[in-house]
Design a protein with these regions (language model features):
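Hydrophobic alpha-helical transmembrane segments in multi-pass membrane proteins
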Residues: 4-10, 115, 164-317, 377-396
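Alpha-helix C-terminal capping segments
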Residues: 26-27, 51-52, 115, 136-142, ...
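Membrane-interface helix/helix-cap signal primarily in integral membrane proteins
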Residues: 9-174
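C-terminal regulatory/interaction regions
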Residues: 2-7, 14-27, 38-39, 43-45, ...
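Juxtamembrane membrane-water interface segments that cap and precede transmembrane helices
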Residues: 130, 160-170, 309-319, 359-376
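Membrane-interacting alpha-helical segments
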Residues: 129, 133, 137-141, 319, ...
Length: 396
């Protein structure tokens, strides 16, 4: 057993070193890209694509006319095979005043180049999973609700930038993402429902297949993979959740060391770890449990948020206390039910309530942000104190 652990440890170190020294399959002189459209976004006169070719790559195309843009909107779909000619570039480091490092962001997604498209050709040989996703998008289009894309597919491209910025500034941007909480809520409900019909082993197989399909539909985000993997493994085998979480964390970093630059990746794991090790504090009635969950998540995420933005919203605990139940237990389930049944009016009613409360609280409060300007070294100390030490303490 000891030898096996040593062999496993050495193997992981070798894989990590290999990934750190990984060289892109494209080169600086590439003028042709062929692959599958995995993601796309229309942004003004620009079409931004994530294409799965030799490896994942971002490709940008600029429209000459409004008519050309509208034509592409009608014909572009997920899963189409695309043939591109143009020029390849290394992504820029920083692109805005907040010093958002675009290159590191792309590296965290294992993207090494950006391709500027000059000529584009599309073919419609789409596989089954992408056909399902395109069918979902077509149904969502009928609702004309930008939030529905976020709640069902984790796609926030349809939500206006100022609204997304308000969510981020107020510490509730996770409500627009397919978080671990949503995955657990959705598939735990499905698992419990199947338990009344099928045997346990059959249930796990069915849920695993459906979970994989859903993870594909939402783009295999790190938080959804983390939550989905933990959900299935904990159903199959009794294992300490924090050990499983740390194992998944390190496996992610071995697969892609640049994930350490991803704020969403760090927040997902750190907040989940805190909720696990302090689960004994989350007791009592519904209000107390929700309050403690928000407080623990706030304490866990604060060092990372301050390090990235040099500011923190002190009201985010109360905002989460208000909006998490509304989104997670009413609007999120309604989003799925609306696709199956004629519940558009009910869904719209609760979305209107949410928007009214959100706008009233956010825009009537001129001092909702409490900026904390701190040096990077102090932020590192906070991360050490509040995030790293608890992890080390639990392991020891």
């Amino acid at each position: 057993m000891k030898k096996l652990k040593i062999i496993l440890g050495l193997s992981l170190i070798i894989i990590l070193i290999f990934n750190l020294n990984y060289k892109s399959k494209y080169n600086d002189s590439a003028t042709y890209i062929e692959g599958i459209i995995d993601k796309y976004k229309f942004d003004g006169s620009k079409l931004s694509l994530e294409v799965l070719g030799k490896e994942r790559i971002v490709c940008n195309y600029y429209f000459d006319t409004i008519e050309e843009k509208e034509s592409f909107k009608k014909k572009i779909k997920y899963g189409q095979t695309i043939y591109l000619e143009g020029k390849i570039n290394i992504p820029n480091e920083n692109t805005n005043f907040k010093l958002f490092n675009y290159r590191k962001y792309l590296l965290s997604k294992k993207i090494y180049y950006v391709f500027n498209i000059e000529k584009i050709e599309i073919k419609n040989n789409i596989n089954l999973l992408y056909k399902i996703k395109n069918h979902l998008v077509k149904k969502l289009d009928k609702f004309n609700s930008p939030y529905l894309y976020a709640f069902i597919l984790g796609d926030t491209n349809y939500i206006e930038e100022d609204i997304k910025e308000s969510f981020q500034n107020n510490g509730i941007s996770h409500l627009l993402a397919i978080s671990g909480m949503h995955i657990t809520f959705l598939f735990n409900g499905l698992y419990n429902l199947l338990n009344k019909i099928k045997k346990r082993k059959t249930n796990i197989i069915i849920v695993t297949i459906l979970l994989f399909i859903y993870l594909f539909l939402v783009g295999f985000s790190t938080s959804s993979i983390r939550a989905g993997t933990m959900f299935i493994i904990l159903k199959i085998k009794k294992i300490k959740p924090y050990k499983l979480l740390l194992t998944i964390f390190f496996l992610f970093l071995i697969y892609n060391p640049y994930l350490i630059f991803s704020q969403s990746f760090l927040l997902s794991f750190v907040v989940t770890f805190y909720l696990i090790i302090f689960k004994d504090l989350i007791k009592g009635n519904y209000f107390k449990k929700t309050l403690m969950t928000s407080l623990i998540a706030f304490i866990a995420g604060t060092p990372i948020i301050i390090y990235n933005y040099n500011s923190i919203n002190l009201l985010s605990i109360l905002l989460n206390l208000l909006f998490v139940p509304l989104i997670s237990y009413i609007i999120f389930p309604l989003s799925f039910l609306s696709l199956l049944f004629n519940l558009k009016k009910t869904y719209t009613f609760f979305i209107n309530i949410f928007e009214y409360i959100f706008n009233f609280i956010i825009y009537s409060n001129t001092a909702y942000m409490a900026p904390i300007k701190l040096a990077k070294n102090i932020c590192k100390f906070y991360i050490l104190l509040f995030d790293i030490i608890p992890v080390a303490y639990k392991i020891i």
